[in-house]
Amino acid sequence: MDIKKIIGQIVFIILITSGISFASTYELEINAGHSAIEGRFDKVMTVKQGILTTGIGAIYNDDGYKIANVKLTLGNGASLPELRLNLGFKGVLGNIEKGNKDGDLTAIGFLFLGKYSIPETISPIPIDVSVGFSYAPDSLCFSDSDRYLDFRASLDFHIVKNATIILGYRYIKVRFDDNRGQWEMSDDALFVGYQLKF
C-alpha cells in the first residue's frame, strides 16, 4: 500500500478525533446550489489562546464529486471588534469523476477564515461578510491528488438570534497525477444556505 496514502489517512483520522473532544457553541449549516449540496457541523470554544473551532463537513455534487472535510482553526478578535480572523488546517477526503477519469482525493491544506460584521449604523439587519480559503500543495496531497484549492465567500444575514440565511459563492479546484497522467477538476457555484447556532 502507498505510504503517502497511509500517512494521509492517519492524519485525517487524528484531525477528526481531535474535534470530537471540544464543545461549547455548535453551528449546523446546510446549503445548496444548482447541482451541489453541502452540510457542516462546527464546534466553537473559547480557550486561553483565543477561539478554537473544529468542524466536519461534506459536499455532494451530482455532476461527479463527493468531498468530506474536517477543519481545525484558532483565531482571535483582531484590533477591530467587527473583524475576526482564523488560521488552521483543513483535511479533505473524497472521490472525483470527470468523463472517464476517476481520482481519489486526500489532502491536508492550510486554512484561512475571515469574517467582518457590518456595523449597525450601515445596515439595520446584522450582516457578516465571510471568506474562506484553503490550499494544499503537492507535498500535503496523498492518493491520486496532486493539488487542492477551495475558496468560499458569503453574506450572512442574521434574521434571528440563532439563525442565519447565507448567500454565497464556492470554488473548488483539484489536480490529479495518476496512471492516466495529469488532469484537473474545477467547479464553482452560487448557493443559498441556512445556519443554526445552539
Q: Can you say where each PLM-predicted feature lies in the sequence?
A:
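Short glycine/proline- and aromatic-enriched beta-strand/turn motifs that initiate or cap beta-hairpins
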Residues: S21-L72
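Outer-membrane beta-barrel proteins and related beta-barrel translocases across Gram-negative bacteria
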Residues: E27-I30, D42-T46, T73-P81, L85-N100
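Small side chains
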Residues: G19, G39, G57, A68, ...
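Short connector loops at helix/strand junctions that flank enzyme active sites
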Residues: I51-T53, Y65-N69, E82-N86, L105-G109, ...
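Outer-membrane beta-barrel transmembrane domain signature
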Residues: A78-E82, G91-F198
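Generic N-terminal leader/processing signal
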Residues: D2-I3, I7, L74, I96, ...
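Cleavable N-terminal export/targeting peptides
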Residues: M1-T25
